[in-house]
Amino acid sequence: MKLSVLVVTLLAVSWTSAQPETFSIQTKEANMNPEPANIRVARSSSAQSNLQWNYWDGQGAVPDGAVSIWNGEEKRTDYVCSCGCSSGFYSTKTGANCHYAYGETEKTCSGFSILVNRDNFENLEWKGGSDGSVPKNAVEVCEKVYVGKNKYGLGKVHTKHEALFLPWHGEEHWYKDYEVLTVNDDVVKQELTQVNYKLDAAHPIKNPPETLRRSSASNSQCRPITKTVALEKAIQTEQSWDVTSTVTFGVESSITAGIPDIASATVSVSVETSLSVSLGSTTTKTTTHTVSVIVTVPPNHYCPVTMVATKYTADIPFTGKMTRTYRNGQKRTTSITGTYRAIQVGEIRADVQRCSEIAGAKPC
């Protein structure tokens, strides 16, 4: 059976499982505080994750949201960490190192990655496995290596070697039965609220006038006449709320927010409204517009009339709160950033062009 798992994208360094005992982030490059490495979730709902591997030197307070367990055997809190492709534990009671198992011994590294669940947003669960098996959405450290534990503490599940390996009092121990860290992706609803637009960063672009319709008023008589020309056109506008992360696709989504008006001299925001949307996708709206104009047409002339509209585009940064509701009733909320993108219509008018003689008209 093909397993659906979490894939770790490590951006700062390239780790291999061949020689993890030589790995150290105590290098000049690693100490430059590399960016957190996001964990990409490879699952049918295709969501980005709030899980991150954050570089940490073990000094000061443990990062907010660090993933931990209570180690009942040692009577302490252990945090999930990794040295290269080997996950293990960090504890405030054992010094500023990450402890991991490799080559039948317990090893440590003093610069390491610690697993952080920002805002405790991801619904993490420990699920059972054995003989190298891992459940759906298991947190992967490297290819075929996953975060695991048993009653003795944290370690790594290596599917190739069909066991959990963990450090214990200076030695490496392995077990055929274990638990694997997973992400619950059974989301049934997500809501975007508390949207705050950064209007000072909004710079709408006024596009050149666009001709939507053409018509004309003609007069074959020998006296001026007055005609009313009406033009009608269905015009499509677009808007989207693109969120940088945490969106779960394929589930019920809604947003409660004001709508920016970008088709004016000053950008303003309407009162809040609730919409059912597909976050990250563009929502379109089609509205039929009608304009009319009275034209005085000289004898034996025709006067072209055009329907002209001016469209505005803008990208506006925003912040907000994303709330997920799971099938089991749990709710998780996180802060998010994103960009509101819109195409709106401003002025719509009828333009009367210069009148011309009707070719071949009978002289008056």
UniProtKB/Swiss-Prot annotation:
It is found in: Secreted. It comes from the Eukaryota. Its EC number is 3.4.-.-. GO terms for molecular function: hydrolase activity; toxin activity. Coiled coil: none annotated. Contains 4 disulfide bonds. InterPro entries: DM9_repeat (IPR006616), Natterin_C (IPR053237). Keywords: Disulfide bond, Hydrolase, Secreted, Signal, Toxin. Its main location: secreted. The keyword Ligase does not apply. Inhibited by tissue-kallikrein inhibitor TKI and trasylol. Plasma kallikrein inhibitor PKSI527 and classical inhibitors of serine-, metallo-, thiol- or aspartate-peptidases evokes a minor inhibition of the peptide digestion. Expressed by the venom gland. Residues 19-42 form a propeptide. One of its GO terms (cellular component) is extracellular region. Residues 1-18 form the signal peptide. Shows nociceptive, edema-inducing and kininogenase activity with release of kallidin from low molecular weight kininogen. The cleavage occurs at Met-Lys bonds. Belongs to the natterin family. This is Natterin-3.
